[in-house]
Amino acid sequence: MAPAKFRAATATALSAFAAMSALLIWAFVQPGTLGMYRWGYGAPILALAALGVLPLVVALAAGSIGHKTPKVGTVAGIASVILSAISMLAAGAASAYIFSNAYGAEATADRPAMIDPAKGLTPRMGPDGSATLRVALSSDPHWGRDASDAKARSAILRLSQAEHEAGRLDAFFDLGDTVETGMMAGGWKVALEDIHRDTPTLPFAGLMGNHDALIGGKARFNAAFGSSSWRMDAGPVHFIALDLLWGPEGFGQRDRAWLESQLSSIPADEWTVVLSHSFFYSSGYIDEETGKPWYDHEDMLRRVAPVLAGRADLVVSGHNHYMEWLEADGTAWAVVGAMGGKPDPVPSYVSPRSVWISQGQFGRLVVELVPEGLSCEFQDHGGTRLFQRTLRK
């Protein structure tokens, strides 16, 4: 292969490599992409990476082989140019598809009655004159997925709105995976329209889930719900929301320091409720597709749980599609991924920390400040009690 042709093939391959590298670097900077890769869903990413590297490998091989067998080197050089063209087309097409969806026209729909975390919630006065607060939490409705149960999620929201109108419910917290694919405006539009229809006046707050973040979905989440990491005070009850999508991939030293400072600032005789999408303790199963265990999250338990144990009274998460109550290290841990997303299979692993679990049912967790303490009640989507625990100081 002639030196000039080798240089041209190598330059073309380097351009293809640079284009694909830029796309992949952007993708991995986005929230949730590293978690998606670590949890075994990185096949498309690996395919794009291979397509970016292969032309350069072939071009370098062409230069090496060309000294001994010019004809083979020439064929390899031509192959490198063809592969480079395919790689650049793939990078361009993927970029156009992702960016046009993630940063395209906004999802035009009325937003729910969003709570301003900085203003918090004002507790009501109970019959005995003491402060009372009652909120509902659920997670993983997955708008945009055919297998989701639209009737169940609507029933949960409508029940919560009716209780709010009756003066019995103060707020609703959606703990993530609101939509199936976060970068798509269509899913957000339908979700926001449905939430606004079913809960027109109910104060609402949302966390970002791993599906909400797909890929570049953070901009659409922020437009819909605002920040997903905050502290919200409601009299003697304090809510702390953490940005934990697949796990602690994005939980750095700054996040840990912020969490430590928030926990330390709450009086010991008041209530601390921590919210996240990814679970900590949970029963679950082995994912047949990836071989990954969807139960007792080792990374979360190693890196984040020690900060919360014994300091947070209650930690509520989604991600796994169960309703479950667990107790460990002086803290109660709840999973409530039951807002209509396809139920997860019957657990093949039951966490040693599990006290109660429901599989295959949709519902919510109702947390209420009562004179005895903090009442925590799982209900099905019709409001029937399934399990209740009262936390006491």
What are the residue ranges of the model-derived segments?
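Short, Lys/Arg-rich, polar N-terminal cytosolic tail immediately upstream
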Residues: M1-P3
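N-terminal active-site segment of His-dependent metallophosphoesterases
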Residues: F6-L48, G77-I78, A90-A185, S283
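Cytosolic-side transmembrane helix boundary signature
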Residues: L48-S84
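Extended active-site neighborhood of metal-dependent phosphoesterases/phosphodiesterases
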Residues: I98-G129, M183-T272, I286-L314, N320-V370, ...
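Hydrophobic beta-strand anchors of alpha/beta hydrolase catalytic cores
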Residues: V135, F172, F239, T272-V273
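Active-site glycine-centered loops adjacent to acidic/histidine catalytic or metal-binding residues
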Residues: D140, G176-D177, G209-N210, H277, ...
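Short, solvent-exposed loop/turn elements at domain surfaces
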Residues: W143-A150, P248-E249, S283, K342-P345, ...
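Acidic, His/Gly-rich catalytic cores of divalent-metal-dependent hydrolytic chemistry
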Residues: P371-C376, D380-K393
